[in-house]
Amino acid sequence: MKKIFDSQGWRWFVDNEGDLGGMWNLHTFYFRFLSPEKDVFQVYGVLNREISIDRLEEVRAFLMDWHLRKFWPKCEYRITDDGQIRVQAENSVHWEYGATDAQLLQQINCGIATTTDFFDKMIERLGL
């Protein structure tokens, strides 16, 4: 993966769990292989801000509307230990028979583009 990122001139980091990460539009993204066989590749983005728990119903309504209208990314929220809402989105593909660098790059670009679009629309709609 680092080779793909370097070929695009992207800045990246490796977190303390060994996941490859990067920043796009101030949002943090992680790129990782999942499953015991490491054949599911996931692009995972985290919204660049937390949202007040008072806005939970608005967040839920926005996510429901998004999922009714869009195939991806899969979007979700979590409540943090300090009672704030943390919004994430993911694009996962099962590459059971392998993938070329070009295929992985296409998934990365799709995951980043659709996730940043989701985040931008949520920020706009909720006035964040």
Where are these regions (language model features)?
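Charge-rich, low-complexity N-terminal segments
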Residues: 1-34, 72, 78
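Short, internal acidic amphipathic alpha-helical interface segments
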Residues: 46-86, 90
